C-alpha cells in the first residue's frame, strides 16, 4: 500500500518539499540558516499576535500599553522581549544566510536570489515599523529621521513624506498605519518565502563545492531534519539566554523615555542591524546621494550574479576571493560600529573609507580577482 504522504493532495506537496526532497550529501551547517529563518518567522508571528492583543496604536496610550504588557499581562515581559530579541536573531540568521549565498555562489540561481532580495527589503521594512510602535524617544525620532529621507526625492519627496505621515509630521496617523503594516507584512513575507522555496526546489540546492551534485543526493528526512533540529536548539538556547539574562543588551535606553517631539535625543540611531546602512547614508554629505547609497547598499546584491566572472561557482577553492570576502565582512563590521558612533572626527573619515571599500570590493575587486584566478587556472 502506498504511503498516505505520497498520495494525499496536501501531504504530497509537503512530502516533496521537506521529506523526500533530494538534497546534496555535502551540505554543511551553513545550509541550516534557511530553516532557522523559518523558525524565527514563526516565533515573530506568534509573539507578535499575542502582543497585538494588548497593544494600542494611539500616541496617547502606546507607550503605556507596552508598559502594561510588561507589568500586568501574564508572561507579557517574556513575549515582549522574545519579540524584540527575536528580531535580532532573525537578522543574524538573515545576514549569515546572504553571506553563505555570496560565498558559495548560490546567487547563480537568479530567481531564488531575487526573491530573497525582495524578502530582505520586506523584513527590513517590517522591522523598521516595529521599532516605531513602542513610541519611545528613539521610536519617534528614528521614524522622523528615516521617513524624512524620502523628502530627498526630487519634485514628489515632500508630498510623499506627508502622505506616509498622514499629516505634517510623525503623529497618531503615522503610528496607526505603521501598526497596520507591521501586522500585515509578516504574512506577505510568509507568502514570499513560499515563492522563494518554490524556485529553490525547481533547481535544487547548491552545495559547498559548487559542483552539480545530481549523482550524489540523499533524502532531506531524516538526515537534514535532524541537522536542522540541532540548529533550532542552538539558536533557541541563544535567544532564551539573551531574553532571560540580558533582554535590553541590543536595545536603546532612550526608548524607555516616552516620545517627546520637543526634545531631540543626543544621538539618533536605528537598531543595530541597520547600522551598516545608516553609516553608508551618513558618509555622504549630500542628502539625495546618501539616500541613493543607502538603497544601493542592499540593491547591489541584485547585480552580484552579473558580476560573477569566475569559472568556478563557489569560493571554496578560490583563496584570493576568500580573502576579499572576509575583508568585506570586516568592512561590514566596521560600518556597523561606525553607525553607532557620533558624527565627529575620526568616525566620519573611517565611515567614508569603509563605505568606499564596501562598494569597491563588490563592484570592482571581486570581478577583477575572479578574472585573475581564471588566468592562474591555466598554469
From Swiss-Prot:
Heme b b566 binds at residues 97, 196. The chain crosses the membrane at residues 33-53, 77-98, 113-133, 178-198, 226-246, 288-308, 320-340, 347-367. The keyword Transmembrane applies. Its main location: mitochondrion. GO terms for cellular component: mitochondrial inner membrane; respiratory chain complex III. It is a multi-pass membrane protein. Binds 2 heme b groups non-covalently. Heme b b562 binds at residues 83, 182. Its cofactor is heme b. Signal peptide: none annotated. Disulfide bonds: none annotated. A ubiquinone binds at residue 201. Keywords: Electron transport, Heme, Iron, Membrane, Metal-binding, Mitochondrion, Mitochondrion inner membrane, Respiratory chain, Transmembrane, Transmembrane helix, Transport, Ubiquinone. Pfam families: Cytochrom_B_C, Cytochrome_B. It is found in: Mitochondrion inner membrane. GO terms for biological process: mitochondrial electron transport, ubiquinol to cytochrome c. GO terms for molecular function: metal ion binding; ubiquinol-cytochrome-c reductase activity. The cytochrome bc1 complex contains 11 subunits: 3 respiratory subunits (MT-CYB, CYC1 and UQCRFS1), 2 core proteins (UQCRC1 and UQCRC2) and 6 low-molecular weight proteins (UQCRH/QCR6, UQCRB/QCR7, UQCRQ/QCR8, UQCR10/QCR9, UQCR11/QCR10 and a cleavage product of UQCRFS1). This cytochrome bc1 complex then forms a dimer. PANTHER family: CYTOCHROME B. Heme 1 (or BL or b562) is low-potential and absorbs at about 562 nm, and heme 2 (or BH or b566) is high-potential and absorbs at about 566 nm. Component of the ubiquinol-cytochrome c reductase complex (complex III or cytochrome b-c1 complex) that is part of the mitochondrial respiratory chain. The b-c1 complex mediates electron transfer from ubiquinol to cytochrome c. Contributes to the generation of a proton gradient across the mitochondrial membrane that is then used for ATP synthesis. This is Cytochrome b. It comes from Artibeus lituratus (Great fruit-eating bat).
